[in-house]
Amino acid sequence: MGQPNVPLVAVVGPTASGKSDVGVALAHLLEREHGRPGEVVNADAMQLYRGMDVGTAKLTPAEREGVPHHLLDVLDVTETAEVARFQADARAAVEDVTARGGLPLLVGGSGLYVRAAVDDLRFPGTDPEVRARWEAELAVLGPHALHARLAERDPAAAAKILPGNGRRIVRALEVGELTGRPFAASLPEQTYLRPTVQVGLAVPREQLDARIDARVERMWAAGLVAEVRDLEARGLREGRTASRALGYAQVLDAFDGTTTEDEARELTARLTRRFARKQESWFRRDPRVHWLPAPDGSDPLDLARRVLELLPVASAA
């Protein structure tokens, strides 16, 4: 039997589509049938954070079934998740797994993080003074007014960034000022850094929505509120990215009394359903992704076998 002959496999798709379980099943399958162990490299931005476990549906050590997982629990909640830093760390993890004879499996649904790991792209640098100036403008004017300013300077970028997304608006203005080029010019091109097979898990919309609703209920039952309370004591509110994570932001609002816990749970489910649609739209725009139907009742091992069938093989000597 030929060996899988590809340097990197990515399992992508929306939240609650079953990526994590397929990643574990694929890792076992590779070792059992090909003698080449698979190791997972996380590509979920919020799973980078230590202690953000319940609300991110992070696999427990037992659920990882002995499969090595990289880039989980590498940031404190007070740290900002930066895609450029992730890119360097993910590429280092891929090279490490490969050097030891394994097959790296990039697993996650954070679209830009996946692209940063698999594609040949370079992110513009940042300047703290320029960033601080635009953030001060954001604080005074608000995101909608700053979005109007971006529209004057870079209409193409403004058309792709929601008026309420202050962080991305600031970044687009910063990049434009530093490079003198449109923000879109710095976005990733679809050119692989190394040969890669990307596989997306496609779940019917109604089924995915139901999975998300059930997952949110399980998170609350599993202690999400207590997890957020613990992380609050460790500086969660100071974290620019961690404090905005779905579920965590809503529970913090409940702590503040601006919403009830029931309302926070319902809002988390609604926003997660919306987020899943955005994730799928992102990955659907990439024609290189091979989509596998993954409806309710799909066996992760069966899906892993179908992923394996998509991989090019090298003939045995």
UniProtKB/Swiss-Prot annotation:
UniProtKB keywords: ATP-binding, Magnesium, Nucleotide-binding, Transferase, tRNA processing
Stated EC number for the protein is 2.5.1.75
Q: Per the record's keyword annotation, is Nucleotide-binding included, yes or no?
A: yes
Q: Provide the reaction this enzyme catalyses.
A: adenosine(37) in tRNA + dimethylallyl diphosphate = N(6)-dimethylallyladenosine(37) in tRNA + diphosphate
- Binding-site residues, substrate: T15, A16, S17, G18, K19, S20
Q: What domain of life does the UniProt record list for this protein's source?
A: Bacteria
Class in the EC hierarchy, top level: transferase
- Site, Interaction with substrate tRNA: residue positions: S110, R131
GO terms for biological process? tRNA modification
Q: GO molecular function of the protein, one example?
A: ATP binding
What SUPFAM superfamilies does this protein map onto?
P-loop containing nucleoside triphosphate hydrolases
Residue positions annotated to bind ATP are G13, P14, T15, A16, S17, G18, K19, S20
Q: Does the keyword Mitochondrion apply?
A: no
Q: Which cofactor does it need?
A: Mg(2+)
Q: What does this protein do?
A: Catalyzes the transfer of a dimethylallyl group onto the adenine at position 37 in tRNAs that read codons beginning with uridine, leading to the formation of N6-(dimethylallyl)adenosine (i(6)A).
Q: Subunit details for this protein?
A: Monomer.
Please report which protein family the annotation says this sequence is part of.
Answer: Belongs to the IPP transferase family.
HAMAP family, sorted: IPP_trans
Q: What is this protein called?
A: tRNA dimethylallyltransferase
Q: Which organism is it from?
A: Kineococcus radiotolerans (strain ATCC BAA-149 / DSM 14245 / SRS30216)
Gene name of this polypeptide: miaA
